[in-house]
Amino acid sequence: MAESWLRLCGAGPGEEAGPEGGMEEPDALDDSLTSLQWLQEFSILNAKAPTLPPGGTDPHGYHQVPGLVAPGSPLAADPACLGQPHTPGKPTSSCTSRSAPPGLQAPPPDDVDYATNPHVKPPYSYATLICMAMQASKATKITLSAIYKWITDNFCYFRHADPTWQNSIRHNLSLNKCFIKVPREKDEPGKGGFWRIDPQYAERLLSGAFKKRRLPPVHIHPAFARQASQEPSAAPWGGPLTVNREAQQLLQEFEEATGEGGWGTGEGRLGHKRKQPLPKRVAKVLRPPSTLLLTQEEQGELEPLKGNFDWEAIFEAGALGEELSSLEGLELSPPLSPSSHGDVDLTVHGRHINCPATWGPPAEQAADSLDFDETFLATSFLQHPWDESGSGCLPPEPIFEAGDATLAADLQDWASVGAFL
């Protein structure tokens, strides 16, 4: 140890000892610390155990067996990494490297013999296995032990697998409604009950079990294949684009009621029929409408409610104008103040309706007429003075008291001024 330290210290400041005692330049040492080229060229099989310094010991005992790498390395401790080449660009982890030996590889599903192959699990559910065992027994009822025996005899996987699959068989028998437990008779030998298939689900369960048994697990079930190959018109529900005769009749009645009917006397009131149906109508009928559930009497009562509620057709025929003309006899009180009377917009579907004449002029015209009336009253008062002799009114003198003589004189002066005007 001391000799190696002295040998390292004996090298100059510009030199450094290499891994094999050689001398390297400082620049080369810096490049080796920052470069990752060694990682791509690294291989576990080619890696050698580090050499111990002279006089050193191996406290952990890693190098007692030659040719083995320290188990502290995660990749070296994995036996799956032995024999696997490590090339740049194709990393191999310890999880993906764990695979069965070549002799234990699973064969293709089409070539599997479940009776002799112990490495491939059958692609059947536990309920299907139970059903297959009951059907193979040719008896109306079967014991649990007989089900176990049939499964192990026909599937080699369950002979070598963990016996926990038997718990799954028992759970399926107890919880699945397709199986019924039959109690043992008193005079029958043995113990434990029997199991059989419920007749309500027997046909469906047996057909599904043996169809799966004949075909490999990767194939499509025959029932689904036949359903997919059928044409849409052959479907029992008629397909998404086919409409039965009853639905077509209902659709025709609906078009006649909405497209050609009117309010009460449709043709007499509106003057014409609709020539085009509604632009958006659904021709697909997925379920019968609610009108099928009504009796003929109820449908007769609902017939007067059918009508055309198209506002555009109503305004084209001028029906609203006739309705508004009937309002001319009504007297509408003007607003309390001119400010509260705003513009009334009677535009419906882009058509403007003029205000009735009884509604009165706008606020500005009413204000102008009010000013004109006040001016007219003032001028008429000046143009037509009081005629004391011609009028039957009493003279103003007796009305006023004795102290108001001056006021009566002033009134007479105003009357004389008005005569000149």
From Swiss-Prot:
Tissue: Predominantly expressed in tissues containing motile cilia.
Gene3D superfamilies, per the entry: Winged helix-like DNA-binding domain superfamily/Winged helix DNA-binding domain
Keywords: Activator, Cilium biogenesis/degradation, DNA-binding, Nucleus, Transcription, Transcription regulation
Compositional bias annotation for Polar residues: 90-99
Top-rank taxon: Eukaryota
Subcellular location: Nucleus
One cellular-component annotation, GO: nucleus
DNA-binding region: 120-210
Keyword Endoplasmic reticulum included in the entry's annotation: no
Disulfide cysteine pairs (residue numbers): none
Gene Ontology MF terms: DNA-binding transcription activator activity, RNA polymerase II-specific; RNA polymerase II cis-regulatory region sequence-specific DNA binding
GO terms of biological process kind: actin cytoskeleton organization; axoneme assembly; brain development; cell maturation; central tolerance induction; ciliary basal body organization; cilium assembly; determination of left/right symmetry
Location, primary (coarse class): nucleus
Function in brief: Transcription factor specifically required for the formation of motile cilia. Acts by activating transcription of genes that mediate assembly of motile cilia, such as CFAP157. Binds the DNA consensus sequences 5'-HWDTGTTTGTTTA-3' or 5'-KTTTGTTGTTKTW-3' (where H is not G, W is A or T, D is not C, and K is G or T). Activates the transcription of a variety of ciliary proteins in the developing brain and lung.
Family per record: Belongs to the FOXJ1 family.
Protein known as: Forkhead box protein J1
Organism: Mus musculus (Mouse)
Biological classification of the source: Eukaryota, Metazoa, Chordata, Craniata, Vertebrata
